[in-house]
Swiss-Prot record:
It comes from Dietzia sp. (strain D5). FAD binds at E99, T107, W108, Y109, W110, D119, Y125, A169. Keywords: FAD, Flavoprotein, Monooxygenase, NADP, Oxidoreductase. Gene3D superfamilies: FAD/NAD(P)-binding domain. This is Baeyer-Villiger monooxygenase 4. PANTHER family: BLR3857 PROTEIN, L-ORNITHINE N(5)-MONOOXYGENASE-RELATED. It is an enzyme of class 1 (oxidoreductase).
Length: 612
């Protein structure tokens, strides 16, 4: 249908009615809104009926330790691993890592469900490839290969000898007298460290919906991050032979559900897919890594690939498209430039916003068309179509998910209200009772309750100030790293740092920055570093300003973790700096090169004080 931009009067050819879509989006949002918002979920460890123990490693027995350190890293996922790697590269030797899991890997240690893969090309997702001499075997690596790479990094940099596994931090307190952090653990350990680096990860604490009757179910229940292969048989590659006589319900159709459904559909006697909100699912087009391409690689190839990918999704001019994936095609399309014959940036501001909205809708219609082209049952196809802005939820890329709904043993149980309840023999969705032997929750992780709530410990800074309280209205940092009143503390997560889609690239860059600062502290006789209150406030204001356009978008979205389940003030991305990653890291590099460390205050090291 022809559509005319109101200010510039430029005609656009689209095949959908924007007003109809807006109305449908609002109806979908209202159907899924809940008064309890984030409170609708509970931690896996709060549900006694569902096992939260580690199914992958035998318990480690050891005595408590007391150590004095230059640096302590909390977390052994890719954030902690890259921190350890760059500390080592910078000649820092007296450091340790503390990790809750039984090995390195973080989310890749815990998530070993069938079909688990990354949704970012593995050649730019997996860090330190050149440094460790490894090239992934396929475009989108399986979780097992990513986990093995985490182990490879640990071995390469000697981090196994520096790490305490199956250990949780329980408390961190700044001691002003000795200019050190004191950190205790659930093992009775006591670490006294000059610098504390936190990299506990965004996907740390599994969550379940608060469903009545969960304790009444007499069958098997588990979360995808605690996959029970003893019950299902098989491995992450599939062949779940023990399910061939089982009726299974999988709850959740986000990134995990989309990956695991094809494997359950292949092996379960019956599969019920419980869906509250459908996902956008576009082609993945995975393939093996070309040996000739590997042979052609020259030093610096991974960083060149990073820069090219980030340049495209940030809207920079780059030479070619090295990654050529769903993300690098998606972000240029979101600008809407392909819809008009003039540069979008030259349009009146109102028309620019409208073109972006139409581009978003156009992408969603392409996702609908893909559903219709694959799913043969019209009612099921309609149930699998999302009705919300394309970027309201992280889009998925998979080549087997939609096809699974053509199998006779697969049923879609869709309801905007989610699960009504669980009985002794099954699950109730939209008033229909489904008899099942096993319920698998693919319901993700806590993302919106704040760092202290997720990580299970508080950080106490100067004058007894609690970081949990200090962050009660959102993160407060300088450049996403440092917080006023919490000297020598470095946050390695995504809070208030530029980040689009490649989480591990962000972790890698933050770890490099942090390790340089630790080295500088050790070399310069510095006792403490800490941002000024003014520098922190200015950065928080800049982050808030950058997110104003996104907050308006998320406010119109169906509930999900991007928008805090409708509570936008607690949205996971509210505290991410909405800026080009290239521009952000160029700014950080310029900050270093100036030599002024603007925004930080350094205090000299005091005379050594014995640690009691």
């Amino acid at each position: 249908m022809p559509f005319t931009l109101p200010e510039s009067k430029i005609a656009i050819d689209i095949d959908f009615d924007p007003d109809h879509l807006r109305q449908r989006f609002e109806a979908d949002k209202q159907a899924r809104e809940r008064k309890d918002q984030l409170a609708q979920f509970q931690g896996l460890d709060d549900v006694l009926e569902v096992d939260d123990s580690d199914p992958f490693s035998e318990p480690i027995t050891r005595e408590p330790v007391t150590e004095e350190l230059d640096a302590l890293v909390l977390g052994g996922g890719f954030g902690g691993l890259t921190a350890g790697a760059y500390l080592t590269q910078n000649g820092v030797e007296n450091f340790r890592l503390v990790e809750y899991g039984g090995d390195f890997g973080g989310t890749w240690y815990w998530n070993r469900y069938p079909g688990v893969q990354c949704d970012i090309e593995s050649h730019i997702y997996m860090p330190l490839l050149e440094e460790t001499g490894y090239v992934p075997s396929q475009r989108y690596a399986d979780g097992s290969e990513i986990f093995e790479h985490a182990q490879r990094i640990g071995r390469h940099y000697g981090l196994y000898d520096r790490t305490y596994f199956q250990t949780r931090a329980t408390h961190a307190r700044w001691d002003e007298q000795i200019q050190r952090w004191e950190v205790t653990t659930d093992r009775g350990d006591r670490f006294v460290t000059r610098v504390l680096l936190r990299s506990n990860g965004a996907l740390t604490k599994p969550q379940l919906p608060k469903v009545p009757g969960i304790g009444d179910f007499e069958g098997k229940i588990f979360h995808t991050s605690r996959w029970d292969y003893g019950y299902t048989g098989g491995s992450a590659a599939g062949d779940l032979a023990h399910l061939r006589d089982k009726r299974v319900a999988v709850v959740g159709t986000g990134a995990t559900g989309v990956q695991v459904v094809p494997y359950l559909a292949q092996d379960a006697k019956e599969l019920v897919v419980v869906q509250r909100t459908p996902s956008v699912v576009q082609p993945r087009n995975n393939r093996k890594t070309d040996p000739e391409w590997v042979a052609s690689l020259t030093p610096g190839w991974q960083y060149e690939r990073h820069d090219n990918f980030n340049g495209i999704i940030s809207g920079h001019e780059v030479e070619g498209n090295l990654v050529d994936d769903g993300w690098t095609h998606l972000f240029p399309e979101l600008t809407g430039q392909h819809l008009v014959d003039v540069p979008v940036g030259e349009l009146p501001e109102g028309d620019q916003a409208l073109v972006a909205e139409l581009a978003d809708m156009n992408l969603l219609m392409s996702a609908h068309a893909r559903v219709d082209s694959i799913v043969t049952d019209p009612a099921t196809a309609d149930g699998l179509k999302p009705w919300f802005g394309y970027m309201c939820k992280r889009p998925c890329f998979n080549d087997e998910y939609l096809e699974a709904f053509n199998r006779p043993n697969v049923t879609l149980a869709a309801s905007p209200a989610g699960i009504d309840g669980i009985t002794s023999s099954g699950i109730v969705v939209a008033g229909t009772h489904y008899e099942v032997d096993c319920i698998i929750f693919a319901t993700g992780f806590e993302t919106g309750s704040g760092p202290a709530g997720i990580y299970g410990y508080d950080v106490i800074g100067r004058e007894g100030h609690s970081m949990q309280e200090y962050f009660s209205e959102g993160a407060r940092t300088f450049h996403g790293f440092f917080t006023h009143g919490f000297p020598n503390f470095v946050e390695l997560g995504m809070s208030q740092t530029a980040y689009y889609v490649n989480f591990v690239y962000m972790l890698d860059r933050k770890a490099r920055h942090a390790a340089r600062l630790v080295r500088h502290l050790l070399d310069s006789g510095i006792g403490t570093f800490e941002p000024t209150a003014e520098a922190e406030a200015d950065w928080v204001a800049e982050v808030r300003r950058s997110n104003e356009p996104r907050e308006a978008y998320w406010g119109a979205c169906t509930p999900g973790y991007y928008n805090g389940q409708g509570e936008v003030s607690k949205a996971v991305f509210r505290d991410v700096y909405n800026s080009s990653e290239i521009d952000f890291w160029n700014m950080i590099e310029a900050w270093w090169n100036s030599g002024r460390f603007e925004g930080l205050v350094f205090e000299p090291a005091r005379d050594a004080v014995p640690v009691a």
